[in-house]
Amino acid sequence: MSEQPHKQRTRTKRASLHEKQDQVRATLSEELREEYGQRNVRVNVGDTVEVMRGDDAGEDGEVTDVDLRDAEVFVEGVTVEAADGEETPRPVESSNLRVTDLDLDDDMRVERLEGDNE
């Protein structure tokens, strides 16, 4: 693997979608870390997250959309006001989030979380 920054950025940008899933991971809260024995997890729609960095730091909200192509996460309540006054969702990088509550409707996700803990 190359050490050159422009090649690193190109590889990240051109990654296929199954590889980009690793780019939308966020750290777990302390309670969830102890419960599942993991430090971070892939962000899914329905998870409750806290924004840790940026203008919206401290905001809590539910994940409304995850864009794998651009590796962006959209959080309920994190918006930017357009010039005409309309509120539009602001994309947040997953590294700037902390997952405080997981959406466990997916059985496969539950198995994956609990399987690493054994």
Curated annotation (Swiss-Prot):
Recite the UniProt keywords alphabetically: Ribonucleoprotein, Ribosomal protein, RNA-binding, rRNA-binding
What family is reported?
Belongs to the universal ribosomal protein uL24 family.
Q: Which GO terms describe its biological process?
A: cytoplasmic translation; ribosomal large subunit biogenesis
Region Disordered: list its residue ranges: 1-24
Q: Which GO terms describe its molecular function?
A: RNA binding; rRNA binding; structural constituent of ribosome
Which HAMAP family does the UniProt record give?
Ribosomal_uL24_A (MF_01326_A)
What is this protein's function per UniProt? Answer: One of two assembly initiator proteins, it binds directly to the 5'-end of the 23S rRNA, where it nucleates assembly of the 50S subunit.
Family matches, as SMART domains: KOW (SM00739)
Q: Where is the signal peptide?
A: none
Which lineage ranks, top first, belong to the organism behind this chain?
A: Archaea, Methanobacteriati, Methanobacteriota, Stenosarchaea group, Halobacteria
Output the Gene Ontology cellular-component terms: cytosolic large ribosomal subunit
Q: Any idea what this protein is called?
A: Large ribosomal subunit protein uL24
